[in-house]
Amino acid sequence: MQFIDRCQIKLIAGNGGDGIIAWRREAHYDKGGPAGGSGGKGGNIILVADHNQSTLLSLKYSKIIRASNGDNGKPDLSSGQNGMDKYVKVPIGTTVYDEQTNEVIVDLIRDKQEYIICHGGKGGRGNAAFKSSTLRAPNLYELGDEGEEKTVRLELKYLANVGIVGYPNAGKSTLISKLSNAKPKIANYQFTTLVPILGIVENNDKRLVFADIPGLIENASEGYGLGHDFLRHVERCEVLIHLISMNPLDHDDVIDAYEKIMTELRKYSQLLVNKKMLVVANKMDVEGASENFNKLRSYLAKKGIDISSISAINGDVNNLVDRVFDLYQKTLSTTTETNPFSIPMVAEKVYYYDGEKTIDDDPLDVIKDGENRWIVSSKKLTYWFKKIPQTTLDNITRLGQKIKSLGVEDQLKKMGAKPNDVIVICDYEYLIDE
C-alpha cells in the first residue's frame, strides 16, 4: 500500500432543509391553522480516529467530502428528515490544520476518538413554528442555514515513544528488526527505507513503540532527500536514538556526520534536539570501526555527551534496550504524564453552530454610492437575507424588523442619510422612511 501521511481536503457539511407554509385542511379542524413543518438539520462531517487506518491514502484523492442536506418541512406539521452525518476515518495520530490560518483544529490520538469538524446547517422553521397567542395564522417561514465549510490539511504523526534517526544506511532498519517484530526491507544501499517503520519492543513486561525514520541527508530540513517528509513523525517521540555507522566506507568524517544530522534536526525544530537522546555507534564489527568510535567518543566527551556501541547485525542490542527503557522512564518522571504513551494532546476547540450565534458582532460596513444611495453590508445582514425569503408580507415585515434591530437606519442617519435615500443590502434596494 502506498504510504501517504499528508493531504488536503475540502469539507462541506449539509445544508439545513427549508421550512414551508401550509394549512390544515381536515374536516374536524374547522378553523384550520398553520401546518407547515420545519426543515431537517444538515448532516455533520465527523472525523474518527481508527486503528485500522495506517495511511491517508483513502483521502488523498478525495478533493471534496460532503454530508447530505436536511429535507424540507412537510405540510402535515412534520419536520423534514435530518441529513446523514458523514464519518471520515483517519489514522490514529492525525493532526488537523485549518488550511487558511494554519492553526491546529484537533489532534486525534485515541482510537475511536471523534470530532465534528463541520457542523450541518440548522433547518429553517415552517409557519407552524411561528404560531402564538397573538399570531394565529403566520405567513412566516425560513430557509435552512448553510452547512459549515472548511479546507483542512491532515498530517499523520506516528505515535511512537522512541525514534531512530540517522544517515541512510546507518543500520536503522537492521536495528529495529533486531529489537522488535518489525520486518523492514534491508539492503546495503541508501534509502532502503522509504516509509517510517514501527516496531514494538518489550523489556521486563514493559513495552515501547520504536519508529525507524527514513534516512536524513544534509539539507533534509529544507526538503532534500526523504527525511524532511518524515521528521514530523519524531515530534511525538519522548526519546531519540541517533544512530551512526562506524564503517569508514559510510562517512568521510564521522564527527562531521554526527554534526550534520544534529543540524538538520535543529533546523527542522529546536524541540527535536531538546528531546532525550542516545548517541549510538553501529557496525562495530567492521574493520576500522574502533578508530572511528574512539574519535567520536573523544569529541562528544568534550560536550558531556555519552556514546554507546553496538553491532546491530550481530544482535548485540540488549544493553541498548535497557538504556532506552531507563531513559524513557526518567523522561516520564519529569512530566505529569504517567501512561506509556506520553503524547501531548492539543485541546479540542468547541464550535457552537447555531446560525446567527456563530457570527461575530461585526460593525456595519457603509459605503456612500452617489448623492442619495448607500450600500450597507455585514455578516448578520447577509445571514438574515439568506434566512428570510421575501416572498410573503409577513416575511418582509420580519426582515425589516431585523434590519432595524441591527441599527442600519440609525447608522445611516448619523452619516447624513435623508428620507427617501436608497439603501442597498445584498442587492436589494429600499427607501429610508420619512
Swiss-Prot record:
Name by which UniProt lists this protein: GTPase Obg
Assigned EC number: 3.6.5.-
Subunit structure: Monomer.
Major enzyme class: hydrolase
Residues noted as binding Mg(2+) in the record, renumbered to the chain: 173, 193
Gene3D superfamilies linked: GTP-binding protein OBG, C-terminal domain, GTP1/OBG domain, P-loop containing nucleotide triphosphate hydrolases
InterPro entries assigned: G_OBG (IPR031167), GTP-bd (IPR006073), GTP-bd_Obg/CgtA (IPR014100), GTP-bd_prot_GTP1/OBG_C_sf (IPR036346), GTP1-OBG_CS (IPR006074), GTP1_OBG_dom (IPR006169), GTP1_OBG_dom_sf (IPR036726), OBG_GTPase (IPR045086)
Cofactor: Mg(2+)
NCBIfam families xrefs: Obg_CgtA, Obg_CgtA_exten, PRK12297.1, PRK12299.1, small_GTP
The organism of origin for this protein: Mycoplasmoides gallisepticum (strain R(low / passage 15 / clone 2))
Key words of the record: Cytoplasm, GTP-binding, Hydrolase, Magnesium, Metal-binding, Nucleotide-binding
Purpose of the protein: An essential GTPase which binds GTP, GDP and possibly (p)ppGpp with moderate affinity, with high nucleotide exchange rates and a fairly low GTP hydrolysis rate. Plays a role in control of the cell cycle, stress response, ribosome biogenesis and in those bacteria that undergo differentiation, in morphogenesis control.
Similarity-based family: Belongs to the TRAFAC class OBG-HflX-like GTPase superfamily. OBG GTPase family.
Residues in OBG-type G domain copies: 160-329
